[in-house]
Amino acid sequence: MFPKLIAASLAALLLAPAAYAENFDVKMLNKGVEGAMVFEPAFVKAAVGDTVTFISTDKGHNVEDIKGMLPDGVEKFKSKMGEDYVLTIAAEGLYGVKCTPHYTMGMVALIQAGAPVNKDAVAAVSLKGKAKARFEPLVAQIVK
């Protein structure tokens, strides 16, 4: 009886973080509150273990990491065009994302998971034009 109780308690403890994981929906839009070609919301404050679901509300969009804007050890990602994509937050830090065909039009987003441990690396990435203009206010929302 006692070993079964210990095993059940350990299983409950190991599964507990998954039970508290949260999902955030981010729409990929042709037109939104911030103008044309946007993610809404463009800034997400998540935790390790949470998921972010990018919803292809308007077709012709995808989601891809911005080179140099992922925490150490996190694998690069790129979704198929016009399909929803679920990103599981695997590590603490900042995740810069873009819509590949609309990147130059400023279709960017930022996810913060826990402490911004890779903030310096994200700041070192050179964005241009509308992508830079839209990304700067997102960086200003980072919580230390």
Segments (PLM) and residue ranges:
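Bacterial N-terminal signal peptides that target proteins for export
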Residues: M1-A7
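N-terminal signal peptide c-region/cleavage motif recognized by signal peptidases
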Residues: A16-A18
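Extracytoplasmic copper-binding redox domains, predominantly the cupredoxin/blue-copper superfamily
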Residues: Y20-K144
